[in-house]
């Protein structure tokens, strides 16, 4: 019985040892798996942490670059608006300059036509001067004939005067009177010289206004012809008078008184004829001088006109260049508008991409929070599983301790019973049967107790197996959750790569926009230069207008003074006309014509001077435009400095935003570090439990 019991106890011990060995092997296997899984999780978490740190750094960099690009785009838009305003102003100024250029061209055309008219009038006046010379030659020939006739008559009269002393005395008195008349003639010749000087001026003026006064010149020619006729009539009358004198000389004794009166009349007529001849000679000389002066003046005027035409051609070429530059500026403005539209579209796309990136980041943050919550739930479930495992391990240890105690008790009891049996064998061999009965009963009791203990231990083993299965299931669930987290992390990494790629595209687009902005800035500088030139031209044109107004006022005053002088001269000529006969009337008419021509010549001279002043002013306008270009460069530099200051302000705002985002990211990192610490603590506890 003892052997059977020992064998059964050995079997039970073997079973318990096998179960204990199996449980230890399974626990060791599970610990190894759990440690490997925890190590993998730790490596993955470290890699994820590193990747997250890198992604955070790159995210910060890209956000900073994106904000800088947005600031640059805003500044570019502002500069574009200012450039468009400046372009509109330049277009307006260029339009005004074109109008002024057209007016200048019209004035130039008028001056050229006026020059042609003056040249035509000069040629006509030269022809008229030649005709007057021919007429003077004819008059001189007539004068010589008349002088010869007078000499003949004088010879006759001298013969008669020898006979008649009284007539000589009377002739002497007549000579005295003639000398006085010569003095008067000298005075009148001086007045005539002054008149001829005025006539020279008038002829110069007539060179510019001949086309208007051709009819008057023809009338003057008709009057000259009438004067010739009158002179011929007078000459015929003189001849008749001479014949009468000859007849009277034959009858001097009879008609003494008549001869004296006729001689006096003849002397007066002679004096008039000589005076008229001298006046005509002086007039011819003066006309020749006037003609030479007019030729010189015409040559000077032609030289000035040629210079003015050359300068006008240069100015027209410069104006054409300016128009070409204006067309270039207009094309550049259109290009700027198109590029601005492209930039606005790119900016809208970049903003939409940034909004999408922010939305995705927000979704990722929500997913991270959800994963953290799931991780917290898993950690709580893991803690509960650990507590259950610890409880089961404590139960197992208690059962092992109880089994050891029971085995020790049974061994003690068996030893005691063996001793008692041996004592009973030695002492009471009689009581063997009783002891056998008791042993049988004890064996039955032991069997029942062993069966009960076996069942109890089997139930405990099944419970332990169930707890191990539950722990394995929990471990499998943890591995699944870890795999899910790894998949989510891979998805986040892919999403991060996409965001990084989009940010790289945005950076490339920003580089393109920066280059476009630089090109736009260069074009803006050119437009500003053109605008400043136009403004300067406008100011100079206004100054020229004011100067022209002042010049017109001065010319009006000069015209008033000339009118007063004209009235004085007319009064003087009227006095002379009252003194003189038909010849003086003709001179008065010619003087009036000369005065008109002088006024017209002065007006033409003033026009030429104004033309020269306009050309000088155009040169000053050109210089002022160059100065405006320089000032435009300075203004553009100032505008760029202001734009940079505005960009710096926007960058400061964006940096403050980036700092806020960085603070939020650091808080998220801190939370993530805390969760990592909690996971590490849990892993450490799991390892400790597995080691136990």
Swiss-Prot record:
The keyword Coiled coil applies. It comes from the Eukaryota. Gene3D superfamilies: 1.20.5.340, 1.20.5.370, Vasodilator-stimulated phosphoprotein. Residues 16-692 form a coiled coil. One of its GO terms (cellular component) is myosin complex. It comes from Dermatophagoides farinae. This is Paramyosin. Homodimer.
